[in-house]
Amino acid sequence: EHPLSAMSPYGQNKIDIEQAIFSDPFFKTDCCTTVLRYFNPVGAFQDGLIGEIPRGIPNNLMPYLLGVVNKVYPFLQVFGHDYKTVDGTPVRDYIHIMDLIDAHYQALNENKTGIEVFNVGTGEGYSVMQIIKAFEQVNKIKIPFKYMPRREGDVETCFADNKKILKRLNWKSKRDIYQICFDAFKFSQKN
């Protein structure tokens, strides 16, 4: 329904995989195929036992932020502060991994032959600085950061048009950005 374009090899790979599915007659007629387009999955299981532990230097905001909290890195690098956003930093749609799991369950219960594509996100965007402030507020921790030049390939704003999944699968995210920040921090402290 929306034109797809990639800003990176990773993004192009995702598009190529979708195109391979769409071009195979088996997926169109003989089975129920659901493509879930994730936006920015973050957070951790609420018991703090399962979460993300990146290898090497993370490229995503939350793992890098947690690396700063855990003294792996001296400060958080904020790439770009001159975007046309609420505070000049990039905006993304962050979805709690537990909400993502719920979306998978809803999709598995969809029993329709053919291919369905759903955007899985909250439909709301938060800037890098809004995430930092939410993390600081909910966890009572100050995050040292420095503004850096923009990264090549980063887009200004990206969030899900999630109307289709809301309507068709009756799915909606339940956890807000504060819960995401709390659960991610809890996991990082246990691991």
Give the ranges of each region predicted by the language model.
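C-terminal substrate-binding subdomain of Rossmann-fold SDR/epimerase-dehydratase oxidoreductases
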Residues: 61-191
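Active-site pre-Tyr helix/loop in NAD(P)-dependent dehydrogenases
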Residues: 1-3, 9, 41-44, 81, ...
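Short acidic, glycine/proline-rich loop/turn micro-motifs
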Residues: 46-50, 89-90
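Catalytic helix-loop patch of NAD(P)-dependent Rossmann-fold dehydrogenases
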Residues: 1-40, 49-60
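A short alpha-helix capping/helix-coil boundary motif
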Residues: 1, 43-46, 140-143, 147
